[in-house]
Amino acid sequence: MMADTLEIVLITGMSGSGKSVALHALEDAGYYCVDNLPPELLAAFVALEHQHHGNRVAIAMDVRSATALPLVPQQLRRLRGEGVTVHSLFLDATTDTLVRRFSETRRRHPLSRDEWYGEPHALLETLELERELLADLREQSHVIDTSAIRAAQLQGYVKSLMPALPGQLTLVFQSFAFKRGVPVDADYVFDVRMLPNPHYEPGLRNLTGKDQPVVHYLEQAREVRQMREHITHFLGHWLEPLAQNHRSYVTVAIGCTGGQHRSVYLVEQLAAEFSDRWTTLRRHRELDGR
């Protein structure tokens, strides 16, 4: 049996979603990293690298290994049975975002080669095939939506996960603007657009839900207090069963119109409230992108 201090972070996801950026972030954090490892070599590689490179290893796999990807869940179960701590991250983005990134970089999608189709196919078709091939891995991983974040932000977020990785369930609270789309990595989504909006108060418009005048304004509203209480009750009831089901992460997304006031306020308050019992992380999609 391997030492129980061995920690593996597996990075998979859509082509163009930022897997290389995430891997570089882990390398900066002290992980020994390898890119595009064939899935059938995973267990042997982990055993070898544990002997030579210490207790923290990060591995990136992509759809170029698609024919062997069904082996990965079984390999991960085997490693966990040997006492290895395994975390699986899946990077994703909207199809429109991926198309734009491929257009900007002028790179060819790895599935566009003839051996997959017998003839060239359009980018949209290859992305659709890739989603189908990676669906099972996505279902078993912590999903990170990179659609609205830059490379430096993604690196920072992946690094922020590091202290939480060895623990049990981690709660990720994320604020967002509905006008920019619902985060694809959300496990639960709460719509708070019906709450009083500080945007229409001239003295609060340029502030955020972190600022005390906005906090004071929102806490005076009965419906804001009720919303917070209802979300707290829901999460308080279901987090323990989720943790017992071996979930490593739960992402709670809270959205308002602009992602600046109401959703930010609730993310800050809920993260503070649940931090006594769970490891919590905070993401403000629209604020972090400024």
Swiss-Prot record:
This protein's record includes keyword GTP-binding: yes
Which InterPro entries does UniProt cross-reference here?
P-loop_NTPase, RapZ-like, RapZ-like_N, RapZ_C
Q: Which UniProt keywords apply?
A: ATP-binding, GTP-binding, Nucleotide-binding
Q: Where does ATP bind?
A: 13-20
Any one Pfam family match given in the protein's UniProt record, by short name: PapZ_C
Q: Which Gene3D superfamilies match?
A: P-loop containing nucleotide triphosphate hydrolases (3.40.50.300)
Which residues are listed for GTP binding in this entry?
Answer: 62-65
UniProt xrefs under HAMAP family: RapZ_like
User: Do you know which PANTHER family this protein is assigned to?
Assistant: RNASE ADAPTER PROTEIN RAPZ (PTHR30448:SF0)
Protein name per UniProt:
Nucleotide-binding protein Aave_3603
Name its species: Paracidovorax citrulli (strain AAC00-1) (Acidovorax citrulli)
